[in-house]
Every structure is written in structure tokens, then in C-alpha cells.
């Protein structure tokens, strides 16, 4: 098994991350800058996987006018770059964390993908993604890419690479789910929107997760925020609760969890071990200002503190 992974980020961003004790609307707010990172959900996943020793190739779209930060990151990390450069600028997302851990996002607009850009991407990506063990498709749709076009591409991709990991929201989530990817990771609110009803109890969440599985999705992982995560597949149902940590930033925590899930699945670990690992990687992410794993012993210690139980 070659254990190669590709991640696709159609709408990446520069994340400007800061800390503001309490945001006051209509006032001047002083913000402590904690970082400016070339990011995007699939890129964050790639960083985690690279730190865990997995060969990763990244793809999607980058704006021509401000691509240098991304190109430098890929070079520094030794990540193979298959991004398609288009006219315009990659967007900037401002993410502010308050003292209570609440994160407020300001997502700016960026480049627009033309029909010719999209046609080229579809043709090119489908020519090389089939060689990978797993493909992770993450994030939102850029301007110019319709949900219908995205569903069509995802469906064609699945015929070439059955193991698609999908993590998105809003219209992109709805569109991608129609292609029945192998693993999906919505949060509880996104699952409620898909189900068209509130899911107040854990049994309601599990019921909705099984409804997704009935559409041909093998693995459904529900992010529960500080409460951890729920994994539902053919083998059972498990709930993992992360250890308590000092929160620095929750930015990229969900992407870190996806990276942990992919790693465990690639290594053919059990569902229990994989969910424990993924929960620990996410907990590690919130305790630092940037995504990544620099201390493997620290990760192992975090794994030992994860509370994982089968759901009865």
C-alpha cells in the first residue's frame, strides 16, 4: 500500500488569526495578532498528514496575485503542489478568538473561477487523482463554481477514487453529499440542516448519521465541538471526548481531526484507535496558534487522556 493522499481545496485563504478579549461592536477593538497563515481546510489537513509522515499532494485553485505565501509553504513542507493558478487574489479570512474561546470569522471574497478555469480543473484533476489511496475534498466553493458542477465532479471523482473524505458546509456540503463520499464530517448543526430537524439528543444525532449511511456513505463522523466527536460506521458507534486544554485558538481543529482520521484509516487502525488519535490531534490543535504536530510524545500523551466509549 503506497499510503498516498491528495487534498483538494477549491477556495483556500490566508488566515489572519488574532485574539481579542471581548469584541465590542461599533467600537475600536485592539487585537493581538497570533499569526498570518497560508491556509484552507485541505491545506491544514495536508500539514497534519505531512507531520505524521504521510506523502501528500495538494490541489485546487490559487489566485495569481498573492500566491507566493502558498508556494513558499508547499516548498518548506515538501508537499507536492498541483494547484491551478487563476486570475485574481486568494481571499483573506480574519479569525478572532475571544477570552471565552468563541471564534468570530470574517471571510472576505477572492478570485472568481471562470467556466474555462473549471473545465481545465475537472479535466486535469480527474487525470491524476485516481492514483491516490485517499482524496480529501474540503472547504467551500469559490465564486464561479456552482453546486451542480461540484456534484458532477465529485461523482466522477468517486468512480476513480472510492475513498473520498469530505468536509464542507452550507451549499457545498449539500452538493457533495449527493455524490455519497466514503467519509463525511459534518458538525451537529450541519447535520441538523441536512436532516431538516433539530437533533437534541445523541440518539437523534445517531439516527441522522445512519440516514446518511443509507445513502452509501460508509463513515459518518459528527463533530460535537468541545464535547468531542461521534463516529458511526458498519462496525458500531463511538463517542470520543477530548481532554481539557488551555484554548489558544480553535482555528483548524476540525481539519486536524480530519487529518487524524485519514492517518488512522490509512494505517488500517481500528475505529476506536483512529477516533482516539483524531480527537487528540484536534485537542492539540486548539492548544496552539497554528495547525500541525511538532511533538509526537505530546500527541501520545494527549491520546491517553481521550475518553472514548461505545454508544449503547
Swiss-Prot record:
It comes from Escherichia coli (strain K12). Keywords: ATP-binding, Kinase, Magnesium, Nucleotide-binding, Transferase. GO terms for biological process: fructose catabolic process. GO terms for cellular component: cytosol. The keyword Repeat does not apply. CDD domains: FruK_PfkB_like (cd01164). ATP binds at residues 223-228, 254-255. Its cofactor is Mg(2+). Signal peptide: none annotated. It catalyses: beta-D-fructose 1-phosphate + ATP = beta-D-fructose 1,6-bisphosphate + ADP + H(+). GO terms for molecular function: 1-phosphofructokinase activity; ATP binding; phosphofructokinase activity. This is 1-phosphofructokinase. NCBIfam families: 1-PFK, pfkB, PRK09513.1.
Amino acid at each position: 500500500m503506497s499510503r498516498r493522499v491528495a487534498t483538494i481545496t477549491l477556495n483556500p485563504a490566508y488566515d489572519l488569526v488574532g485574539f481579542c478579549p471581548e469584541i465590542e461592536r461599533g467600537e475600536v477593538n485592539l487585537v493581538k495578532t497570533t499569526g498570518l497563515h497560508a491556509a484552507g481546510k485541505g491545506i491544514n489537513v495536508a500539514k497534519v498528514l505531512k507531520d505524521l509522515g504521510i506523502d501528500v499532494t495538494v490541489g485546487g485553485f490559487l489566485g495569481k496575485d498573492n500566491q507566493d505565501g502558498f508556494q513558499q509553504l508547499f516548498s518548506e513542507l515538501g508537499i507536492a503542489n498541483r494547484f491551478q493558478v487563476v486570475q485574481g487574489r486568494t481571499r483573506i479570512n480574519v479569525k478572532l478568538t475571544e477570552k471565552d474561546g468563541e471564534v468570530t470569522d470574517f471571510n472576505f471574497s477572492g478570485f472568481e473561477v471562470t467556466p474555462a478555469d473549471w473545465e481545465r480543473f475537472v479535466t486535469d484533476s480527474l487525470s491524476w487523482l485516481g492514483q491516490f489511496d485517499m482524496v480529501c475534498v474540503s472547504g467551500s466553493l469559490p465564486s464561479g463554481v456552482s453546486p451542480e458542477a461540484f456534484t458532477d465532479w465529485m461523482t466522477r471523482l468517486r468512480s476513480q477514487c472510492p475513498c473520498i473524505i469530505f468536509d464542507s458546509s452550507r451549499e457545498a456540503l449539500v452538493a457533495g453529499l449527493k455524490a455519497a463520499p466514503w467519509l463525511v464530517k459534518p458538525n451537529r448543526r450541519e447535520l441538523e440542516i441536512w436532516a431538516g430537524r433539530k437533533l437534541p439528543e445523541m440518539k437523534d444525532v445517531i439516527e441522522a448519521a445512519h440516514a446518511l449511511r443509507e445513502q452509501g456513505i460508509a463513515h459518518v463522523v459528527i463533530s460535537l465541538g468541545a464535547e468531542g466527536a461521534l463516529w458511526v460506521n458498519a462496525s458500531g458507534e463511538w463517542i470520543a471526548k477530548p481532554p481539557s486544554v488551555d484554548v489558544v485558538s480553535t482555528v483548524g481543529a476540525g481539519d486536524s481531526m480530519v487529518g487524524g482520521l485519514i492517518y488512522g484509516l490509512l494505517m488500517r487502525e481500528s475505529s476506536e484507535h483512529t477516533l482516539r488519535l483524531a480527537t487528540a490531534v484536534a485537542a492539540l490543535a486548539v492548544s496552539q496558534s497554528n495547525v500541525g504536530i511538532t511533538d509526537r510524545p505530546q500527541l501520545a500523551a494527549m491520546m491517553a487522556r481521550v475518553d472514548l466509549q461505545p454508544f449503547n
